[in-house]
């Protein structure tokens, strides 16, 4: 009966895919972490990765707590993301995914806690984009 719950929000499979895309961006951070010559970028890549993982874990637990556990077949790591070696751009990519979920979840008052979680994540990623400007790691500017 899960289908009736999702009438006004994005497809459950799309939510699951979005969650696993976020995890892949966390892995992308590790690629930056290992390949950079900048100590600042090395440390920031791990900070960004930890932020993404913590947020994604909380997002998944909260979403599945409200809508129910996904079936194993609803989950896949076979996702396509825009791989990048620019931490600022990577932060924006994760915010774009979270914002798509926020737009739909904002329609349901009972999901206000998840909307707040997403808003906090967006603020955290904005700070990380700013920190990435130090040592010229990135000159990326967050979208308004």
Question: Which functions belong to the PLM regions below?
Answer:
Residues 24-47, 104-111:
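Helix-loop segments that flank and shape redox-cofactor active sites
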Residues 40-71:
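Conserved alpha-helical segments that form or flank metal/cofactor-binding pockets of metalloenzymes
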Residues 10-25, 80-83, 87-90:
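Disorder-to-helix initiation segments
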Residues 75-129:
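Acidic/histidine-rich alpha-helical segments that form the ligand environment
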Residues 65-69, 131-144:
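Long amphipathic alpha-helical segments
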Residues 30, 53-54, 110, 130:
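Extracellular secretory-pathway ectodomains and N-terminal mature segments of eukaryotic proteins
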């Amino acid at each position: 009966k899960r289908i009736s719950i999702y009438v006004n929000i994005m497809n459950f499979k799309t939510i699951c895919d979005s969650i696993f895309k976020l995890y892949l961006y966390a892995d992308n951070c590790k690629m930056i972490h290992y390949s950079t010559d900048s100590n600042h970028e090395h440390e920031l890549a791990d900070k960004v990765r930890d932020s993404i993982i913590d947020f994604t874990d909380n997002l998944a637990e909260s979403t599945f707590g409200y809508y129910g556990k996904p079936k194993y077949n609803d989950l896949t790591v076979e996702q396509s993301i825009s791989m990048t070696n620019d931490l600022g751009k990577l932060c924006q990519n994760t915010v774009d995914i979270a914002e798509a979920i926020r737009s739909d979840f904002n329609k349901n008052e009972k999901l206000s806690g998840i909307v707040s979680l997403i808003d906090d994540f967006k603020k955290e990623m904005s700070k990380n984009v700013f920190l990435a400007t130090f040592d010229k790691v990135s000159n990326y500017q967050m979208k308004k």
